Amino acid sequence: MKLHMLNMLNCLLLTVCDGHLHMHGNGATQVFKPRLVLKCPNAAQLIQPGKLQRQLLLP
């Protein structure tokens, strides 16, 4: 469940950064493509799994 939330948040974040990103059933594959991270350098630190997971685990 937490992993699903992590993937969803990353998909939404990258969709905002990259207007050409299309959401598919296997969105997780899209999320971790390096080119998408490079297109959105300001959000790169949010995309790091460790940081985002810590945010999800906080109340």
From Swiss-Prot:
It comes from Amblyomma variegatum (Tropical bont tick). It is found in: Secreted. This is Anti-inflammatory peptide amregulin. GO terms for cellular component: extracellular region. Its main location: secreted. Keywords: Secreted, Signal. Residues 1-19 form the signal peptide. Transmembrane segments: none annotated.
